[in-house]
Every structure is written in structure tokens, then in C-alpha cells.
């Protein structure tokens, strides 16, 4: 064996070194030439030499799970089981060289010594012995035969492919047929009558179990069941020049904000000698502080300086972009809320700041749901302790509630929590919802409890409100307060919604089947299929080589770091005896709207009460370039439930925005005579909501060439938010086009489609539980005193700053040129002045799609399109500056619009639009 590894020197390769040899990369059953790095070839050779074919398959499953989730802890924990000898553990340093740099620090920590794992105890199986003489972890057969057609089986299941896990037995009723035949809680059901359950959804598993009188189950004694989801926020980090970088060394674990502040400053090594400094600021009359900050405890971050104005006191005192503010006037900024930090910096003319030169900034955030498991030793406790504290039911490392026995999905018999209280629901809602959303949900529940609305109306309203995977799980707690006579209807409606979302997210082709091995417990099973890899055994080695190469060469979210904003969501737990067929349609009942709660904003220009918010918005990769966000359709989602009014949209004058608000603030105590855009503006990240049961992919991004940028011009004030309150598209394939100044080329960043249903909402209502673009378009990239001081809100008539009304004409297109599906031959010419640094629209569609012509789905606040006031969400764009978009694919149409905005030949763009959709 040593002879086989003579050429496998760990120290001979360096991270990122590229090999010159070409090798075949497996993908969709085909092979193509690709340059593989020396690290990839080295690891692949070692895998062939050290592992058997089944072990390599398990290794492939392990990498699939890591590639889908980017969870280093799960990767290392699985490798501890697979690499069970010192010789096999020689693969670890080779694997380290091909994982993304941002994960290597965590990989080193979890593997103890960095390169080699210490000797570990074997994986502990359940203490009870498996029936029929099978040892723990072995596959056995359980035969169940109903004496009557409608006799119950006596057990409940949870899990499914929509949750990224298999099908597990979560409850076995005492004295039931299942108990007599040896079925146990914690068993994973692999097959039912020769039908594999490896990749089936929860509903499909129920159908398979109820479809026959005689059942022969192949079960695996896993000794654990999925307990729920913990939602982790993943951040990308950049340096002051906008280049992607690794996270700060003080944030490796994602639980820092929950530590005591006194402990953090020592345990996280924030106060090493030379790292921090004291800055004494005394603001005289007419002098501005000139700081732009980002972060806050509500985002799991500290307070970071993202902008320093030229000539300000902050610049004179040596503050710079990339500094973290640790303390101000004796008040710790390590776990302070964003608004409190803004208030404190505004409140004094004499500031003593303690700052640390971190040299990194949080750039963009995405949300990842991680499955938490309940060990066999705690399963019985979780079943019997219905009123117990949920935090006591999870495995090690789980600090938040993770398991409840009455979740949404279907009727549950013995495993339901009939005595769930509203306090438990309120506690979960505090973790998952904003105050506004929580108040709205409680309003609907009060209306239902008072008999004002029916259970159907309540469920439909909650579907509209709980529009993300994490939020949707709250239905498990809502079920506890549903009246007994309404439980069947409630379960039926929720199950129907789940099935609809599953169908909407069906992959285009079959994926690689899962196995019952220990290393694939948490495998989502979608990553290989989503990349089109072959599913045949003969291509296993090519798949493994392709996966390793992909992991090293994919432009990943460099510098990601899991933060503390974790929230836990329960998995559906369904008794196979009580599921009814979802065949009825949802009624169109409109409940009364909730009282409009107050909205407040995160971003303020400190010391300037009448100035609009300065948003730290231009992407970091260039000084001040404009951007347009586009989206292309992937899978159409069903229309939103009828009769449910969307959540009230906060206006620009409100004091607090929704959670999707940018987490930045500009700080200035006095109005400076002039303001210039910084050399490094930071991106404003817009969060997009996703429907239930998401699979979050890491969005690739391209490095943007630096571009010299002139100062941004004045922007027209935005109109009323009611001007663009149209609903956005449901399922989108987001494409970001960064429109640079004419001396640079635009970048195009693509993010994989999230095939979930999404209910209609406006941009200001978007939840932060969705996928975040790695770089996005600026919303308000520049700010000048002339464009912001003493200016009122513009009305829907939309006149420019000189009082001249923008031209708007209507004309009729020829019948021969009418796009297919256009209901009326009426079009409108709208002239959009380039009044802001960004155009600020998102489009979907293009040639060869279900939407032949691009349609506007989002209009960002502060952009030129928003300032114009005439472009609306839903407008179909026929021409841009006289150039037709017929026959142009999505990317080409986006390029045409981007070039039209970028050109200096004219200071406006003429859009020929129609009010009607062009859906075919």
C-alpha cells in the first residue's frame, strides 16, 4: 500500500496550483476535456489506491452532501466513520487542498490537528438490539399484513426528499402490528415491497405504505430521526477593495454573538496587541463624522466601517474601511443592534472609539437550512415529554428548538401535541418572524379563535405570510391551537400545499440513488442530479473525479462564515394511518386584513433629518458603477392563494424597514459642503424569499475588473411605493448584470434557480430567508447635497427636477409585429431619465422561454426606473431605444438594456412597453 502512495506527497502541492494535464470530467454521462489541477489528480489517485469501490461510492455521497450544503462539520463527522484507519486518513490533507479556501480553517479545526484526525471511537449505535438477530446498523426485513383493508399500521413516519433526508419511523404505537413485528423508532425505511424510498417525497412514501395490504419493509437501524432544521445565515466577506476573502479569524464557528461579551473579547482574540487602537473624535461646528457603517447584532455581526468620507473627521482620525468598531464611549459594539449603534454615534460630539483593523467586510448573506438529528437515547424522551423544553431534545451542538411532534403536513395520531400552547408558538415565531410578521400572524389567529374567519381562510393567510422554508415550519405549532373539529381540514390543506410545492420542484431528471450507509444520512441527493452527472455504476469514478474537480474549481462563496442567526424548524411527522387524499381545491376566502403595523428603517444618514437615506450600495468591485438585476424564468409556480392581501408595504418615510433592508447606515453630524462617492462603495444586498423546503445553492460569481468611476449624479426622489406594488414573478433564475462605466465591461453573475413556489410580494416585503446574490446592483450609489436636501416626495405624475414632464406617448404596433400572446395591440413609449447610478429593474423571460419578451418583475427603490414612476412591474418590454427585443434570448435582452443604460450618447432610455403579459 505504501508503494502505491509513493507519489502522493502532501507537501508537494499548494492550494490553487493548476495542473496541465487534461482529463475527462463526468457530467450527464458525457465526457469533455478539462484541465485538472495537480491536487485533484493527486486525491483521485489516492482514492483509487486506498478505498474500495463501495467506499469510493460512499466518499462520493459525502462530497455530494458537502457540495450541496457547504457544511464542513458534517463532512468531517462523516469522514470519521468512513476513514477508519490511519492509512485511509492520509486522504484528509489531500482533500483539504481541494476544498474552498474559506472552509479550510474550519476543516483544520474539526480535524483536530489540521492534517490528520486523531483516533476516534466508532460510531455509537443504539443500545437496544435490532430484532430478528440483526445487529445495530444492519438491514432487516419487517413484514406487515393488514387483516382488514382499513386497519392501521400503528406507526408514524417523518422525512422525505423535500427535506433532504430519508424516511424514518418517528413513532410506534404500543401494542400495534408494527411493534409486534419489530419496527422501532429510529428505523430508516429503505424499501417498501421492492420500491425504493431513497429519493421519494414524504407524500409518495405515505402513498407507498398505504397502497397494499401486505408490506415488506427493508429497514435500517439508524438509531436517530431528523429533528428539524436550523436556519444558518452564511456571509461572504470582502476586503476594502471589494475582492473576495476569507472570514475574520474571530468568526469561525458562527456562535460568537451568543457568548458573553466579556468572554468574546478574549476567546475570540479581538484584543491582541497591535490589533486595536483608540480614536478620539471631537466634532466641531460644520464638521461631519463621515462614517458609513454596516452590521449589527440582529444580523449576527459586529459593526464595521464600510465608508469614510474624504475630508471628514473620521478620515482625519485615521479610521478606514474595514475597521470594526469595538467600543464607543465605553459602550461595547460587539453585540449592539444596528439602530442603537447609529443612535449612539449621533448622540455625542465627543467620541472615543475603540476600533480593530480587521481588513474585511461582510458583503452578502444567504440562508442555509441544516438538518438536526435526535439520537436514539433521546427519542423516547421526546415522544413522552410533550411539554418539555425543545432544546433538551436535540443532539450535541444544537442549542435551539429542533423537534416537535405535531408539525404541519398530515393528521398525526399519538405523536401529536394536543396541549401545545400559544406561548410555544410565540416563542418559535420570535426566532423566525419579524415583529411585523408576528403581529400579523397573531392577528389572524385571534380572528380564527374568535370565529371571525374559517380555518380555510386562516390557512390561506398563513400561506401568504409564511413564505419561506423556515417560516412554513411554524404551521406545526399553529396546529396545536386549531380546534379539534378543524384539524382534518387544516391537515388536508397543509398537506396539499406541501404536495404542490414538491411537484413544482421536481428535478428534470433522475438523481443518483441514496444508500443506507452511515455516510449518507444527511445527503440531500440533489446535487449530483442537478449537475447532470451520470447515474450508472460504470461512471462512478468519473463522477467522483468530476465532483472533486468541481469542488476545487467552482467559484464559490469565498469567505463564508456561519453566524448565530439560527432558527429551528420542525419536520412533518405523519401517521400513515390517518392521511387523506388531497383532492379538494382551496376555497377563495378573503380574511380581514391585519392592522398595519409600524415600519421602521435601518439606514439613516446621521445628523441629517430631512435627507433621504444614503444606502451603501454600489458593488465593491468598482468605484461607482450602475447595475441592473435581471431574472429568467425556470419553473412557473401556481398562482398565489386568492383573496389574501399582501403584507402592507412600508413607505420610504417609515422608521424601520423589513428584514430585507440593507444593514448599513451613513453617519454625518453636519451637512458637508460637498460629498464625493467613495472609491469603494459596498453592495446593497437584496434578499429574495423562497417557498417551503428550499435547497440553497452557493451562487458563483465572476471577478469584476476595476473601473474608474466619476461621481454619481443627483437622483430624483422616489414616488409612492404604491406605484410599484405589483406582485413579482414566482420562480426566477436570477442573473445579475453589473453595468460599469463605459471603460469597463459588465459582469454577468448567474445564480442557480431555486425551484420553489413563492407567493406574490413587493420588493420591500422580501424575506431575508432566501438566496443572496454574491454581488448585486447599486440602488443609490451616489449622494450629493443638491440632490437630497429639502426635497419632498415626488407624486405619481413624475416630473423631472426642472419641472418638465417626461414624455409619454402611445402608439399602436402593426398586427404583423404583434408579439405572440399579446392581448391588445397597444404599446406605450416611456422615457426613463438616467437620474440615478442604477437603472434598478429586474426582468424575466426572453426568446425560447415561456415568456418570449422580457417582462419587468422588480423595480428597485432609488433606481432610475423607480424615479421615473411610469415603468411598472408587469410591463413587457418590446423595444429599447428603438431596438426590438423580439427573438432575443434573456441574456441578450439584458445586455441590450445594460448597454443602453451605460452609453453616454444620451441621458435617457426609451422603453416601448405594453401593459399585457406575453405568456404563452
From Swiss-Prot:
<feature type="domain" description="PDZ 2">
    <location>
        <begin position="278"/>
        <end position="360"/>
    </location>
</feature>
<dbReference type="GO" id="GO:0005884">
    <property type="term" value="C:actin filament"/>
</dbReference>
<feature type="domain" description="PDZ 3">
    <location>
        <begin position="829"/>
        <end position="912"/>
    </location>
</feature>
<dbReference type="GO" id="GO:0051649">
    <property type="term" value="P:establishment of localization in cell"/>
</dbReference>
<comment type="function">
    <text>Involved in hearing and vision as member of the USH2 complex. Necessary for elongation and maintenance of inner and outer hair cell stereocilia in the organ of Corti in the inner ear. Involved in the maintenance of the hair bundle ankle region, which connects stereocilia in cochlear hair cells of the inner ear. In retina photoreceptors, required for the maintenance of periciliary membrane complex that seems to play a role in regulating intracellular protein transport.</text>
</comment>
<dbReference type="GO" id="GO:0048471">
    <property type="term" value="C:perinuclear region of cytoplasm"/>
</dbReference>
<dbReference type="InterPro" id="IPR036034">
    <property type="entry name" value="PDZ_sf"/>
</dbReference>
<feature type="modified residue" description="Phosphoserine">
    <location>
        <position position="698"/>
    </location>
</feature>
<feature type="region of interest" description="Disordered">
    <location>
        <begin position="241"/>
        <end position="262"/>
    </location>
</feature>
<keyword id="KW-0597">Phosphoprotein</keyword>
<dbReference type="GO" id="GO:0098794">
    <property type="term" value="C:postsynapse"/>
</dbReference>
<comment type="subunit">
    <text>Forms homooligomers. Interacts (via C-terminal PDZ domain) with MYO15A; this interaction is necessary for localization of WHRN to stereocilia tips. Interacts (via C-terminal PDZ domain) with MPP1/p55. Interacts with LRRC4C/NGL1. Interacts with MYO7A. Interacts with RPGR. Interacts with EPS8. Interacts with CASK. Interacts with CIB2. Component of USH2 complex, composed of ADGRV1, PDZD7, USH2A and WHRN. Interacts (via PDZ domains) with PDZD7; the interaction is direct. Interacts (via N-terminal PDZ domain) with USH2A (via cytoplasmic region). Interacts with ADGRV1/MASS1 (via cytoplasmic region).</text>
</comment>
<dbReference type="GO" id="GO:0043025">
    <property type="term" value="C:neuronal cell body"/>
</dbReference>
<feature type="compositionally biased region" description="Polar residues">
    <location>
        <begin position="242"/>
        <end position="257"/>
    </location>
</feature>
<dbReference type="Pfam" id="PF00595">
    <property type="entry name" value="PDZ"/>
</dbReference>
<dbReference type="GO" id="GO:1990075">
    <property type="term" value="C:periciliary membrane compartment"/>
</dbReference>
<dbReference type="GO" id="GO:0021694">
    <property type="term" value="P:cerebellar Purkinje cell layer formation"/>
</dbReference>
<dbReference type="GO" id="GO:1990696">
    <property type="term" value="C:USH2 complex"/>
</dbReference>
<dbReference type="GO" id="GO:0005886">
    <property type="term" value="C:plasma membrane"/>
</dbReference>
<dbReference type="GO" id="GO:0010628">
    <property type="term" value="P:positive regulation of gene expression"/>
</dbReference>
<keyword id="KW-0770">Synapse</keyword>
<feature type="region of interest" description="Disordered">
    <location>
        <begin position="502"/>
        <end position="536"/>
    </location>
</feature>
<dbReference type="GO" id="GO:0032391">
    <property type="term" value="C:photoreceptor connecting cilium"/>
</dbReference>
<feature type="region of interest" description="Disordered">
    <location>
        <begin position="561"/>
        <end position="603"/>
    </location>
</feature>
<dbReference type="GO" id="GO:0007605">
    <property type="term" value="P:sensory perception of sound"/>
</dbReference>
<feature type="domain" description="PDZ 1">
    <location>
        <begin position="141"/>
        <end position="224"/>
    </location>
</feature>
<dbReference type="GO" id="GO:0050910">
    <property type="term" value="P:detection of mechanical stimulus involved in sensory perception of sound"/>
</dbReference>
<dbReference type="GO" id="GO:0001917">
    <property type="term" value="C:photoreceptor inner segment"/>
</dbReference>
<dbReference type="GO" id="GO:0030426">
    <property type="term" value="C:growth cone"/>
</dbReference>
<feature type="compositionally biased region" description="Polar residues">
    <location>
        <begin position="655"/>
        <end position="674"/>
    </location>
</feature>
<dbReference type="GO" id="GO:0032426">
    <property type="term" value="C:stereocilium tip"/>
</dbReference>
<protein>
    <recommendedName>
        <fullName>Whirlin</fullName>
    </recommendedName>
</protein>
<dbReference type="GO" id="GO:0019904">
    <property type="term" value="F:protein domain specific binding"/>
</dbReference>
<dbReference type="GO" id="GO:0043005">
    <property type="term" value="C:neuron projection"/>
</dbReference>
<dbReference type="GO" id="GO:0001895">
    <property type="term" value="P:retina homeostasis"/>
</dbReference>
<dbReference type="GO" id="GO:0036064">
    <property type="term" value="C:ciliary basal body"/>
</dbReference>
<feature type="region of interest" description="Disordered">
    <location>
        <begin position="630"/>
        <end position="730"/>
    </location>
</feature>
<dbReference type="GO" id="GO:0045184">
    <property type="term" value="P:establishment of protein localization"/>
</dbReference>
<keyword id="KW-0963">Cytoplasm</keyword>
<dbReference type="InterPro" id="IPR001478">
    <property type="entry name" value="PDZ"/>
</dbReference>
<keyword id="KW-0966">Cell projection</keyword>
<feature type="compositionally biased region" description="Polar residues">
    <location>
        <begin position="785"/>
        <end position="800"/>
    </location>
</feature>
Amino acid at each position: 500500500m505504501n508503494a502505491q502512495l509513493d507519489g502522493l506527497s502532501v507537501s508537494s502541492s499548494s492550494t490553487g496550483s493548476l495542473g496541465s494535464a487534461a482529463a475527462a470530467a463526468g457530467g450527464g454521462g458525457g465526457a469533455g476535456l478539462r484541465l485538472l489541477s495537480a491536487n485533484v489528480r493527486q486525491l483521485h489517485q489516492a482514492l483509487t489506491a486506498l478505498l474500495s469501490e463501495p467506499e469510493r461510492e460512499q466518499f462520493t455521497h459525502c462530497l455530494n452532501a458537502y457540495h450541496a450544503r457547504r457544511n464542513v462539520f458534517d463532512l468531517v463527522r462523516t469522514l470519521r466513520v468512513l476513514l477508519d484507519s490511519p492509512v485511509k486518513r492520509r486522504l484528509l490533507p489531500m482533500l483539504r487542498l481541494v476544498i474552498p479556501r474559506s472552509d479550510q480553517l474550519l476543516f483544520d479545526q474539526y480535524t483536530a490537528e489540521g492534517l490528520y484526525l486523531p483516533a476516534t471511537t466508532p460510531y455509537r449505535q443504539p443500545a437496544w438490539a435490532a430484532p430478528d438477530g440483526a445487529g445495530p446498523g444492519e438491514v432487516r426485513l419487517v413484514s406487515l399484513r393488514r387483516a382488514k383493508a382499513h386497519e392501521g399500521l400503528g406507526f408514524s413516519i417523518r422525512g422525505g426528499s423535500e427535506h433532504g433526508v430519508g424516511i424514518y419511523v418517528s413513532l410506534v404505537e404500543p401494542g400495534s402490528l408494527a411493534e409486534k413485528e419489530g419496527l422501532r423508532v429510529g428505523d430508516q425505511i429503505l424499501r417498501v415491497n421492492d420500491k425504493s424510498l431513497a429519493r421519494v417525497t414524504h407524500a409518495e412514501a405515505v402513498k407507498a405504505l398505504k397502497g397494499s395490504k401486505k408490506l415488506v419493509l427493508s429497514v435500517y437501524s439508524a438509531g436517530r430521526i431528523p429533528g428539524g432544521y436550523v436556519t444558518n445565515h452564511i456571509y461572504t466577506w470582502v476586503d476594502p477593495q471589494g475582492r473576495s476573502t476569507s472570514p475574520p479569524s474571530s468568526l469561525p464557528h458562527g456562535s460568537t454573538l451568543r457568548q458573553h461579551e466579556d468572554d468574546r473579547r478574549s476567546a475570540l482574540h479581538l484584543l491582541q496587541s497591535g490589533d486595536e487602537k483608540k480614536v478620539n473624535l471631537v466634532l466641531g461646528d460644520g464638521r461631519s463624522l463621515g462614517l458609513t457603517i454596516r452590521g449589527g447584532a440582529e444580523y449576527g455581526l459586529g459593526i464595521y466601517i464600510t465608508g469614510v468620507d474624504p475630508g471628514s473627521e473620521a478620515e482625519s482620525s485615521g479610521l478606514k474601511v474595514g475597521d470594526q468598531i469595538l467600543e464607543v464611549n465605553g459602550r461595547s459594539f460587539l453585540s449592539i443592534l444596528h439602530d442603537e449603534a447609529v443612535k449612539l454615534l449621533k448622540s455625542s460630539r465627543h467620541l472615543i472609539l475603540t476600533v480593530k483593523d480587521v481588513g474585511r467586510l461582510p458583503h452578502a448573506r444567504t440562508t442555509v437550512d441544516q438538518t438536526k438529528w435526535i439520537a436514539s437515547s433521546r427519542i423516547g424522551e421526546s415522544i413522552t415529554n410533550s411539554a418539555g423544553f425543545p432544546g433538551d431534545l436535540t443532539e450535541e451542538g444544537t442549542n435551539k428548538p429542533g423537534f416537535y411532534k405535531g408539525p404541519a403536513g398530515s393528521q398525526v395520531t399519538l405523536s401529536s401535541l394536543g396541549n401545545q400552547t400559544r406561548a410555544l408558538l410565540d416563542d418559535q415565531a420570535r426566532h423566525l418572524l419579524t415583529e411585523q410578521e408576528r403581529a400579523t400572524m397573531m392577528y389572524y389567529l385571534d380572528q380564527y379563535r374568535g370565529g371571525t374567519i374559517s380555518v380555510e381562510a386562516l390557512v390561506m393567510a398563513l400561506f401568504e405570510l409564511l413564505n419561506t422554508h423556515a417560516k412554513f415550519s411554524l404551521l406545526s405549532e399553529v396546529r396545536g391551537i386549531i380546534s379539534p373539529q378543524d384539524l382534518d381540514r387544516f391537515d388536508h390543506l397543509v398537506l396539499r400545499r406541501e404536495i404542490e410545492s414538491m411537484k413544482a420542484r421536481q428535478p428534470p431528471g433522475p438523481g443518483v440513488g441514496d444508500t443506507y450507509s452511515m455516510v449518507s444520512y444527511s445527503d440531500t441527493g440533489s446535487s449530483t442530479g442537478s449537475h447532470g452527472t451520470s447515474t450508472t455504476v460504470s461512471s462512478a469514478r468519473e463522477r467522483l473525479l468530476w465532483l472533486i474537480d468541481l469542488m476545487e474549481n467552482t467559484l464559490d462563496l469565498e469567505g463564508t462564515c456561519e453566524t448565530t442567526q439560527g432558527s429551528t424548524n420542525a419536520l412533518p411527522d405523519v401517521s400513515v394511518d390517518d392521511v387523506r387524499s388531497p383532492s379538494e381545491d382551496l376555497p377563495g376566502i378573503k380574511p380581514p386584513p391585519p392592522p398595519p403595523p409600524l415600519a421602521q428603517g435601518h439606514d439613516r444618514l446621521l445628523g441629517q433629518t430631512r435627507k433621504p437615506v444614503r444606502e451603501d450600495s454600489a458593488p465593491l468591485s468598482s468605484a461607482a458603477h450602475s447595475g441592473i438585476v435581471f431574472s429568467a424564468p425556470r419553473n412557473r409556480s401556481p398562482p398565489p392563494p386568492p383573496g389574501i392581501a399582501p403584507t402592507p408595504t412600508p413607505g420610504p418615510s417609515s422608521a424601520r424597514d423589513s428584514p430585507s433592508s440593507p444593514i448599513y447606515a451613513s453617519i454625518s453630524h453636519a451637512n458637508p459642503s460637498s460629498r464625493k462617492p467613495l472609491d469603494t462603495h459596498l453592495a446593497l444586498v437584496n434578499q429574495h424569499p423562497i417557498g417551503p423546503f428550499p435547497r440553497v445553492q452557493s451562487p458563483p460569481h465572476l471577478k469584476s475588473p476595476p473601473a474608474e468611476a466619476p461621481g454619481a449624479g443627483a437622483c430624483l426622489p422616489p414616488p409612492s411605493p404604491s406605484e410599484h406594488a405589483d406582485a413579482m414573478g414566482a420562480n426566477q433564475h436570477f442573473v445579475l448584470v453589473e453595468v460599469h462605466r463605459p471603460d469597463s465591461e459588465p459582469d454577468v453573475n448567474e445564480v442557480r434557480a431555486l425551484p420553489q413556489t413563492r407567493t406574490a410580494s413587493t420588493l420591500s416585503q422580501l424575506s431575508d430567508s432566501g438566496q443572496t446574490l454574491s454581488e448585486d446592483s447599486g440602488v443609490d450609489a451616489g449622494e450629493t447635497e443638491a440632490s437630497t436636501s429639502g426635497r419632498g416626495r415626488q407624486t405619481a405624475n413624475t416630473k423631472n427636477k426642472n419641472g418638465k414632464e417626461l414624455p409619454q406617448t402611445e402608439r399602436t404596433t402593426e398586427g404583423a409585429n404583434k408579439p405572440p400572446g399579446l392581448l391588445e395591440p397597444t404599446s406605450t413609449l416611456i422615457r426613463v431619465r438616467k437620474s440615478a447610478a442604477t437603472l434598478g429593474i429586474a426582468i424575466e423571460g426572453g426568446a425560447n422561454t415561456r415568456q418570449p419578451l422580457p417582462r419587468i418583475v422588480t423595480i428597485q427603490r432609488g433606481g432610475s426606473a423607480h424615479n421615473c414612476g411610469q415603468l411598472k412591474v408587469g410591463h413587457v418590454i418590446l423595444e429599447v431605444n428603438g431596438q426590438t427585443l423580439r427573438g432575443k434570448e434573456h441574456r441578450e435582452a439584458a445586455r441590450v438594456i445594460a448597454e443602453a443604460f451605460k452609453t453616454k450618447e444620451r441621458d435617457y432610455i426609451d422603453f416601448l412597453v405594453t401593459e399585457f403579459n406575453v405568456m404563452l
